[in-house]
Swiss-Prot record:
InterPro entries: UPF0178 (IPR003791). Coiled coil: none annotated. PANTHER family: UPF0178 PROTEIN YAII (PTHR35146:SF1). Pfam families: DUF188. NCBIfam families: PRK00124.1 (NF001095). This is UPF0178 protein RPB_3201. It comes from Rhodopseudomonas palustris (strain HaA2). Belongs to the UPF0178 family.
Amino acid sequence: MTEAAPTRIYVDADACPVKDEIYRVAERHGLPVSVVAGSFIRVPTHPLIERIAAGSGMDAADDWIAERVQPGDIVVTADVPLASRCVKAGAEVLAPNGKPFSEESIGMTLAVRNLMTDLRSSGEITGGPRGFTPRDRSAFLAALDTTIRRIARRRPSPPAQPQT
């Protein structure tokens, strides 16, 4: 019987405001982290943290994550199309503000994102999302911890070792 790979956290890192929080939570739970960016990004030196410079293509970092993510992994991204791809692959996906993306919500989220993009490009709406707040940071930490615990409960326990 093969053992399930440990949960890995993938970070869409180019504009992620909660990288430091992810590193701390991952270390506490002993989970590996892949920090994926389009180019070089500074990360702490730690055996659980892997830095990936995916290349300068428009969606290089997104493609790198989407091609590797598996059920039971966690992806942190504000990129709705990437979130959609990862949800379809069976991953748990969180926005940096702690909002989870799910199979039930991703279709509507993607439709709203596309509508807002069209409205912005036509000049109907100017500006972008509100700024990131300490409340968002706290909500993210709570959501990440809850997600890790939920995944751990779903994974089968390792077989008991025979006593000698």
